């Protein structure tokens, strides 16, 4: 199949500046990532008080009820009427006036016209020439919508300008943001159904294989790769091959293992595990194009269908293995759990548990969010839900997800944070996308090109700076009969330093029998 598809060679990166502390903190200069020139922190949860918010929610209806001389039912009535306006007002005020978490990073304080070009007189007057000609910061949600509609442009490279967004954008909550959250996201969270999953996944992944070849490259893997060397710029293919190798090692993959790959995408891991390790892999995806691509790829690698296959089905309808027990030795779920919806997350993990042999292992790669949030984190998450991954509302802080894992009977063996690895992967996707601009625009239009340019560029920043991150979990059933000692050799994070040598103390000889 790859012989019939042309991929761009990832365009060369521009030369990056050396590390310095000109902005107030020391920046990095690794060729593996796009290094942050302005890693500023904005306002966030440290100045947000739930106590004050809940007090206002209770006291405002209470005060009105008291003045009217009425009772509890009246309080409930006014609470229901006023709750949403109070919430909107409080979040708007706090996101507008809260102080930054810290001010170690100093803003350049350049005029907004240094970064952006507005294309209508009204927008120029509002943002570019106001405030004595210096302009005013634009709410990031407002900017997104204007940019997608072609009413404002970056002066320079999208990613380079987004690196300085704290200097030209605010993270104030807007009416449009509230509208989407209340009328778009909340109903999806509540009603997250199987038919909804099918509609959203197929709309996203069956858009056209060419759409994804234009940024994913030959491996066609839509998940984070892994950096192995921070002193050089590894190719996108190297990052993904690193990840595949890490996955196989972490689950101690062996010939003949029966593996279920939930959300298998275009079948690259399925093909890798089948061809290199001789595993029997069943990959499942809702994408029809992905199913066709994956099965063709397996055939090209000489994998018979009675060994491995890609099945187009919902995870709730995953087929049983060919083992007498019908269960799997290993299960892999790579950035799939986020899409099941927070309401069904526990049920999804229970299904993984029930499909796994008692001595099996679960590899789960999961995109998460930081608990100590900043307003830019919340706005980025809402953008992602609106434009990129509708229904993917189960990205959560680590503590919540780990609690769900443990509550269904899994024991977490290890967890690795690979957020900066994701940033490296996204940086290469971004450059591929920019390099294929003409192809994208000719087929899908300027708006789709801009949406995904912004998505990829902002995600490079978000996953490097901590707005979003990614975790690799290895889990096993938390039962007494599990032979835990067998997995010790695979715990490379523990074994590596030990094998390098541990001798340090003076020899002790004063023993007694």
Curated annotation (Swiss-Prot):
S-adenosyl-L-methionine binds at residues 222-223, 259-267, 285-290, 315-316. Disulfide bonds: none annotated. Disruption phenotype: Produces only non-methylated glucosylceramides. Has a decreased hyphal growth rate. InterPro entries: SAM-dependent_MTases_sf (IPR029063), Sphingo_C9-MT (IPR052290). Pathway: Lipid metabolism; sphingolipid metabolism. It is an enzyme of class 2 (transferase). SUPFAM superfamilies: S-adenosyl-L-methionine-dependent methyltransferases. The keyword Transmembrane applies. Its main location: membrane. Its EC number is 2.1.1.317. GO terms for biological process: filamentous growth; glucosylceramide biosynthetic process; methylation. One of its GO terms (cellular component) is extracellular vesicle. It is a multi-pass membrane protein. It comes from the Eukaryota. Belongs to the CFA/CMAS family. This is Sphingolipid C9-methyltransferase. The lineage of its organism: Eukaryota, Fungi, Dikarya, Ascomycota, Saccharomycotina. The gene is MTS1.
